[in-house]
Amino acid sequence: MVQPGTEIKASDLTLLVITIILFAIFIVGLASVCFRWTSRQFYSQESINPFTDSDVESRTSITAVRGLDEAIINSFPTFLYSEVKERRIGIGGVECAVCICEFEDHETLRLMPECCHVFHADCVSVWLSDHSTCPLCRVDLCLQPGERSYLNPEPDLVESTNSHLFDGVTWTNRNRPSRSWSTRLSQCRVSQILISRSHSTGHSVVQPLDNLDRFTLRLPEEVRRQLTKKTVDNVAFSQARSSRRGYRSRSAGSERSVFSYQRRMHSFSDCAWSTSCGGEAVAPSKDSRRISVEQSQLDDRV
């Protein structure tokens, strides 16, 4: 027969084991709750301030380097379509590749000097503020004279335009009435799509451009010279006026780079336009040489 003391000791041992198990479960549960709460607080702070100051500065500097300087953008030939409509080479209408709208007489256009592609000034300014290439053929607009010539862009660039236009952003437009910059944007539907990496599916995700000539403005040599001279003179006048008034918004290095770009555009303009736009090579005129000399003198003063 079992002694009474033995039964009491067995009951105490069972109770002790159960107590230890419950205590262990309580400790594990408490630790889990604390861990979850701490993790939630950490990720909440990360979502509010995901980047450190150094990350923000680095991202800002990278973004700033990607686009063109505003003064360089303004140095591209800018004019009203009515000024060149009757003097351009070719037949048919000319359209802006950004908003797919045909140009009208009262609209201001901006011409890419390296490839002769033309866009609405407002449309292409948005692109050039984040990129340094032509939005249509992707020719580099910042090439220096010693680098690969921008007169002969890679053939793949033009063909890839069918599937890479604007990094996967398709602009579509169905109506073409008279419009301003704001109404052009309201008519254009911007749809985010997968970039060229989705071509493995077997079909293009961007509408093909079957005729790039409708986005190209070819002008006679004399007209081109007049537009270039007018634009460069306007930029030089604006720079000189702002310098005299003491309202410089850029450093001396930035100003010198702009003037250097303008001189390069003068020195290469004859060859660039005649070669890339289908014209014949013409020797620089006395006016062009005079403008280059005056521009160099103005740069030295600055």
Swiss-Prot record:
Comp. bias (Basic and acidic residues): 286-302
Spans annotated as Disordered: 279-302
One term of GO molecular function: transferase activity
InterPro entries xrefs: ATL1/ATL16-like, Znf_RING, Znf_RING/FYVE/PHD
Pathway assigned in UniProt: Protein modification; protein ubiquitination
GO cellular component, one term: membrane
Residues spanning the membrane: 15-35
Any one biological process term the GO annotation gives: protein ubiquitination
Primary localisation category: membrane
Source organism superkingdom: Eukaryota
Topology within the bilayer: Single-pass membrane protein
Catalysed reactions listed for this entry: S-ubiquitinyl-[E2 ubiquitin-conjugating enzyme]-L-cysteine + [acceptor protein]-L-lysine = [E2 ubiquitin-conjugating enzyme]-L-cysteine + N(6)-ubiquitinyl-[acceptor protein]-L-lysine
Top EC class for this record: transferase
Documented EC number(s): 2.3.2.27
Zn-finger region bounds: RING-type: 96-138
Comment, domains: The RING-type zinc finger domain mediates binding to an E2 ubiquitin-conjugating enzyme.
Protein name: RING-H2 finger protein ATL38
Organism encoding this protein: Arabidopsis thaliana (Mouse-ear cress)
Gene name of this polypeptide: ATL38
